[in-house]
Swiss-Prot record:
Homodimer. It is found in: Cytoplasm. It catalyses: dUMP + (6R)-5,10-methylene-5,6,7,8-tetrahydrofolate = 7,8-dihydrofolate + dTMP. The active site is at 159 (nucleophile). It comes from Thioalkalivibrio sulfidiphilus (strain HL-EbGR7). Pfam families: Thymidylat_synt. This is Thymidylate synthase.
Amino acid sequence: MQPYLDLMRQLLEHGTVKSDRTGTGTRSLFGHQMRFDLSKGFPLVTTKKLHLKSIIHELLWFLKGETNIAYLKDNGVRIWDEWATEDGELGPVYGRQWRAWPTPDGRHIDQISQVVEQIRTRPDSRRLIVSAWNVAELPDEGISPKDNARAGRMALAPCHTFFQFYVADGRLSCQLYQRSADVFLGVPFNIASYALLTLMVAQVTDLEPGDFVHTFGDVHLYSNHVEQAKEQLSREPYPLPKMHLNPEVKSLFDFRYEDFTLEGYQAHPHIKAPVAI
């Protein structure tokens, strides 16, 4: 995970001090890219322990097309609680856009099913893309996330905005464009989530995993995460673990939490840090 640590160090040393929506303040860079060869291990940060259960359940929740946090809460995942309404609604966030993008004529497009079929039938297509950036349903920046959700808009604008698959030599790669990235808390989750999605899609399309490429717009370190970042950078990373998927699963939507086994994950202790709301 050296590319991730190098990015955090670069933010500490060269980041531009900026204000932000939350009022916390950040050190920010614009335009950065990391690449992880998924054949060399699963890119899960080892310089602090991550809650893999949350990462897996959130991804499965996205793939279900759900936008209510009930499934997450039922499985002990609280990462979306701060932005949901009293009824657990978040508005048309990732799952809705991935699985049921609304069209002007009242239909809905299942982008995930569509892209899996395209990978199988047209692997050389340059349109193997899934987007969560639906301009018509973005939140009003003048009101709170909960009020946006109550009004039928997204509680939060998508941070991981769109992703593209690429097939070459029997290997499936994925590139994510992330417009906004919280490097200390969010990015380790995002890396693992999209790496896992790539493994899953590769399995159901009979391909080998290739690279996960992570491209950033505004990548930032919040001012109240600086000391935590320094502590993390003082630690020596461990070798990457391996992720095993149940080989019996043939449909992307049939994966369950029990179908994932992480082998050899050795990590330094968790580092607490506040979430910028």
